[in-house]
């Protein structure tokens, strides 16, 4: 399975050299990214009408990053060339039989003269050849050091993600630090959290086909993969792109600044010893990272013998992931207590959840209908949402579908379901930037509510006498205190954190040491949500809108 068409963006070496010169010429600030104004100046030389240029930008910037890297620039130039020769420009052209590799560069009126004038000036640095912003991450990494956080200029923001980093450091992070949001809800964000590739997490009871599912998508096994009928995967494995095939231990992964897993250190060495990263070169992993999880156990005793907080780890990954696949087996439809807790920990991420009924070719059509009904019944008691979750039925493995059980109708159904699921996965990189904005806004709202709760608890404490007794009373009646905060500030009840978890963390703190309400700080976050983020999206939208 390919996330993007291989043809678009590939070209001969001669054409690549031409495009490289054009890219360097049009990239006025030499940061390896062509943004709105640069694009308008350069693309105008093609003499194409504005609606066609708008469509070309939309297709080239398919991930909606707000800029074109070198690879996206090549795609744009190839589309310009096609438009000049009379082709209709649409998304379908990428999957058509057009020979992208041998498309001649487009005609750009007056470009040769302008480039000749610029020849005497020093050449700008080489752009990142693969189109990803990896070369630019070092430019923004130093923003996260406390000394430089106040000095980030607006001109240094060259993408939507850069803009989110700047807003986080200058406006949201001070609120999180003041009210200890990182201790109660989620660790502070780092540079790598913003630059990470989209992630897909697979959850399910043992032997429901999680590892086989990843193997099926990659069309090869990954380092450290174990497949069998018994509980084989005994650890959390992140499968991501890398220069060679290797497994990296969890403690090493957690301290690497270029990986978004530093927040996992809060779960301790017991968890990190059950966590590893598998790297391998693969075109699919250039766009998506997979998280393979241990099979959820069915017995309460096995759960209590885990040395780490399995539900907490799952919840941490859920907040980082773009898609969560719950895998079920027709022979394992019971939702165990631990699985129920795991699904409950996904609260707030309902839009990411997809249910997969795997190994469906192991039962005949009549049994499959009954199994599907039983699965819906089981999930209805666990997923406390009125909306229906999308359920995919199929057999996601390299083995041919067992037609003896399902018949030709079953085969056709499974193939259509597989196509739908693959289409969902293909959409992930395209929606990654939108998802990042969505998660950022969600985090900002959670931080605001957290600040209201903490400042309210501080306000309820006595000035001098009886502090210990007052603190215990507040902790015991925490649900009532949440209700007071909700009514006082007119907040939605569903946005409040889990009471039991909050109580557990709160019991280790002295409420009297907490900060009072700082209206100015909260107003800054409100302004960020109301004005700064819409302005950021406006600045990096399609320049031809």
Swiss-Prot record:
GO MF entry, a single one: calcium ion binding
A Pfam entry, by short name: EHD_N
Residue ranges annotated for the Dynamin-type G domain, each copy included: 194-429
Coiled-coil stretches noted in the UniProt entry, renumbered to this chain: 467-490
Subcellular location, record wording: Endosome membrane; Cell membrane; Cytoplasm
Membrane topology: Peripheral membrane protein
Positions of region (G5 motif): 382
Residue numbers spanned by region G2 motif: 230-231
Positions that bind GTP: 204-211, 309-313, 359, 395-398
Induction text: By salinity stress.
Subunit description: Homooligomer, and heterooligomer with EHD2.
Protein name, as recorded: EH domain-containing protein 1
Origin species: Arabidopsis thaliana (Mouse-ear cress)
Encoding gene, per UniProt annotation: EHD1
């Amino acid at each position: 399975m390919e996330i993007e068409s291989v043809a678009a963006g590939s070209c001969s070496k001669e054409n690549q050299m031409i495009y490289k010169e054009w890219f360097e010429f049009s990239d006025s600030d030499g940061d390896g990214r062509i943004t709105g104004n640069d694009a308008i100046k350069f693309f105008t030389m093609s003499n194409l009408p504005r609606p066609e240029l708008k469509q070309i930008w939309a297709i080239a910037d398919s991930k909606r990053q707000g800029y074109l890297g070198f690879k996206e620039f090549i795609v744009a130039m190839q589309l310009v060339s096609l438009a000049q020769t009379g082709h209709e420009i649409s998304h379908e052209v990428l999957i058509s039989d057009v020979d992208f590799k041998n498309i001649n560069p487009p005609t750009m009126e007056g470009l040769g003269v302008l480039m000749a004038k610029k020849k005497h000036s020093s050449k700008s640095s080489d752009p990142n050849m693969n189109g990803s912003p990896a070369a630019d991450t070092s430019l923004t990494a130093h923003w996260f050091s406390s000394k430089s956080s106040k000095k980030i200029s607006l001109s240094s923001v060259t993408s939507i993600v850069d803009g989110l980093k700047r807003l986080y450091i200058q406006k949201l992070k001070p609120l999180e630090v003041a009210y200890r949001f990182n201790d109660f809800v989620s660790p502070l964000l780092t540079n790598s959290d913003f630059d990470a590739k989209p992630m897909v997490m697979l959850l399910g009871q043992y032997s429901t086909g999680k590892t086989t599912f990843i193997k099926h998508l990659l069309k090869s096994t990954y380092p450290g993969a174990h497949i069998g009928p018994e509980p084989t995967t005994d650890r959390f494995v992140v499968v991501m792109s890398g220069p060679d095939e290797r497994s990296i231990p969890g403690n090493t992964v957690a301290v690497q600044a270029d990986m978004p897993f530093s927040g996992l250190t809060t779960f301790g060495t017991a968890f990190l010893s059950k966590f590893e990263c598998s790297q391998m070169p693969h075109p699919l992993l250039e766009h998506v990272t997979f998280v393979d999880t241990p099979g959820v156990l069915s017995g309460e005793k096995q759960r209590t013998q885990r040395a780490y907080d399995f539900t907490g780890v799952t919840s941490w990954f859920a907040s980082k992931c773009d898609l969560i696949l719950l895998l079920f087996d027709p022979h394992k439809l019971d939702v165990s207590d631990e699985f129920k807790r795991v699904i409950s920990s996904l609260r707030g991420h309902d839009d990411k959840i997809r249910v997969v009924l795997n190994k469906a070719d192991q039962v005949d059509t009549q049994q499959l209908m009954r199994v599907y009904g039983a699965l819906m019944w089981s999930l209805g008691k666990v997923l406390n949402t009125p909306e229906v979750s999308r359920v995919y039925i199929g057999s996601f493995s390299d083995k041919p579908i067992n037609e003896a059980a399902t018949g030709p109708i079953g085969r056709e159904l499974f193939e259509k379901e597989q196509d739908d699921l693959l289409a969902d996965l293909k959409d992930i990189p395209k929606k990654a930037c939108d998802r990042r904005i969505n998660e950022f806004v969600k985090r900002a709202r959670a931080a605001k509510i957290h600040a209201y709760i903490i400042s309210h608890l501080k306000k309820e404490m006595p000035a001098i006498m009886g502090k210990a007794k007052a603190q215990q009373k507040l902790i015991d009646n925490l649900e009532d205190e949440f209700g007071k905060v909700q009514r006082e500030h007119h907040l939605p009840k569903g946005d409040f954190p889990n009471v039991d978890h909050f109580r557990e963390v709160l019991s280790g703190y002295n409420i009297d040491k907490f900060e009072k309400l700082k209206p100015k700080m909260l107003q800054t976050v409100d302004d960020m949500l109301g004005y700064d983020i819409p302005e950021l999206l406006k600045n990096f939208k399609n320049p031809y809108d």
